[in-house]
From Swiss-Prot:
Belongs to the cytidylate kinase family. Type 2 subfamily. Keywords: ATP-binding, Cytoplasm, Kinase, Nucleotide-binding, Transferase. It catalyses: CMP + ATP = CDP + ADP; dCMP + ATP = dCDP + ADP. It is found in: Cytoplasm. This is Cytidylate kinase 2. The gene is cmk2. Disulfide bonds: none annotated.
Length: 178
């Protein structure tokens, strides 16, 4: 079984994907810019500003997405990334998590700290930068996800356990097996 899960920052992609992987005994694949920043011993905000937004060649985007594309070919996996539903062509189930920006900003603030107004502004800016980069690099509009997914879940008013249950029900309904 292969599952691809996408959504913008603060939607619970990582949390829910890891729950799915653990429940079904699947490999959890979630390699992000945060991981690259940690590997380089650079704070994420600095890495994002200098290496993602500050470069014109999209090197790190292509590095990350190539690695995820290779990993997405493995069986018995849950791939969680912004572009998972586009990258994982052979996924048995493609899921997109959606939440209002204000809710995502609150969740990010709870996870990472900071002032709400700053987190809201940086969340908006990151969304806009991601959209521009993915359009430029891959001609992918990350706001046009409905035709690429099997299941869209609005997570604005539900917690990760409820999201997991909805996904588990869909997996069972489709009779997907590990």
């Amino acid at each position: 079984m292969k599952i691809a899960l996408s959504g913008k920052s603060g939607c619970g992609n990582t949390t829910v994907s890891s729950m799915i992987a653990k429940h079904y005994g699947l490999e959890f694949i979630n390699y992000t810019f945060h991981d690259i920043a940690r590997e380089r011993n650079i704070p994420f905000s600095e890495f994002y500003e200098k290496e993602i937004i500050g470069r014109d060649d999209y090197y790190w985007d292509m590095y990350l997405d190539k690695r995820l594309s290779l990993l997405s070919k493995k069986n018995n996996t849950v791939l969680a990334s912004r572009l998972a539903i586009w990258i994982s062509k052979s996924a048995d189930l493609k899921i997109y998590l959606y939440a209002k920006m204000e809710v995502r900003a609150e969740r990010i603030m709870t996870r990472e700290g900071g002032m709400y107004s700053d987190v809201l502004s940086s969340t908006f800016n990151r969304d806009e930068n991601d959209k521009k980069r993915y359009l430029s690099i891959y001609n992918i509009d990350i706001d046009d996800y409905s035709s690429k997914t099997d299941l869209v879940i609005d997570v604005t008013n539900i917690n990760s356990n409820e999201v997991f249950e909805l996904i588990r029900d869909e997996i069972d309904k489709r009779n997907l097996k590990n």
